[in-house]
A protein has these predicted regions:
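Short, conserved beta-strand element in jelly-roll/cupin
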Residues: 36-37, 47-66
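Histidine-centered metal-chelating micro-motifs
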Residues: 42, 61, 80-91, 107
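Structural motif
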Residues: 31, 40, 59-61, 98
């Protein structure tokens, strides 16, 4: 990594797994990750770090829960970005999309805490190396 440019289209074409992010670059203490997403993730929270999303293709919804329990959703389409603030419980869902994320290296894709059992299609990981 860091030895040359990474073509995101080619990187996305190199794997099919959903909710299983690949690390395409590292900068400072952050990973740049890409993922295919479809279906529901799990409600989870990252207590100490924000989470940045960029939709590369498709639609990506992020349900969030405020401190008083009120739920609200951010709907993102191709080219949209969104930052989930640290400490906010959230659950991504998608009918099918490709996304890019900036996350503090070592951040688990299922957060510091999550609710319920993990669905089989959700990979609890700090990211996999590309290729």
């Amino acid at each position: 990594m860091g030895q040359g440019p990474v073509n995101l289209s080619e990187a996305l074409a190199s794997f099919d797994a959903i909710w299983s992010p690949r690390i395409v670059a590292r900068m400072n203490d952050y990973d740049v990750r890409i993922a295919h997403v479809e279906g529901e993730h799990v409600w989870h929270v990252h207590e100490d770090t924000d989470e940045f999303f960029l939709v590369l293709d498709g639609r990506f919804d992020i349900a969030m829960r405020s401190d008083d329990g009120t739920e609200y959703t951010a709907t993102l389409l191709k080219g949209d970005t969104y930052v989930v603030p640290r400490g906010v419980f959230h659950r991504p869902t998608s009918p099918g999309a490709s996304i890019l994320m900036f996350e503090l290296s070592g951040t688990s894709s299922t957060g510091d805490h999550h609710e319920g059992d993990l669905p089989e299609h959700v990979d609890s990981t700090a990211g996999h190396e590309l290729g």
